[in-house]
Design a protein with these regions (language model features):
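C-terminal catalytic lobe of FAD-dependent flavoproteins
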Residues: 59-140
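Active-site lid/adjacent beta-loop-alpha segment flanking the redox-cofactor pocket in flavoenzymes
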Residues: 2-95
Length: 140
């Protein structure tokens, strides 16, 4: 949506209960109601009710008045059972490498996940602060 002010330097904002987030996306703000609806893989489409819920939550928590939604979309989020990403070689399927389960954090975690995957594939150094065993598929 168009916030009618300069937002390029704004941080990503998530409310404490994780019921919405918004972040700069060019001159606009990208927003989400942080909803999760279990479903089979499909060509998912946004629901107008979810757009209205996001608007209501953001307007209730901020001083912003959302007058116009520029575009709306929906996406499927994949989670592992423990809700952590899965990165590593599968011991039950030789040659198969997992890089999945980022849930709603794929864009934000992609640099760290890519570096972790690169290290696992090439035998390089894992980024500081990442324990590959906590992310590996063999933890299940």
């Amino acid at each position: 949506f168009d916030p009618h002010q300069e937002v390029a330097g704004w941080p990503m904002v998530i409310d404490i209960e994780e019921t919405f987030y918004f972040k700069p996306d060019g001159r606009q703000l990208l927003a989400s109601p942080c909803d999760e609806a279990p479903m089979a893989p499909c060509d998912v489409r946004h629901e107008e009710l979810d757009v209205a819920i996001a608007i209501d939550r953001i307007q209730s928590a901020t001083t912003m008045e959302i007058r116009h939604v520029t575009s709306a979309w929906a996406g499927l989020r994949t989670f592992a059972p423990d809700r952590r990403p899965v990165v590593g070689w599968d011991s039950t399927a030789p040659g198969f490498f997992w890089l999945a389960g980022q849930g709603g954090f794929g864009i934000m975690t992609s640099p760290a996940m890519a570096a972790t995957a690169t290290a696992a594939i090439t035998g390089g150094s894992v980024p500081e602060g990442i324990n590959p065993e906590r992310l590996g598929p063999n933890r299940f």
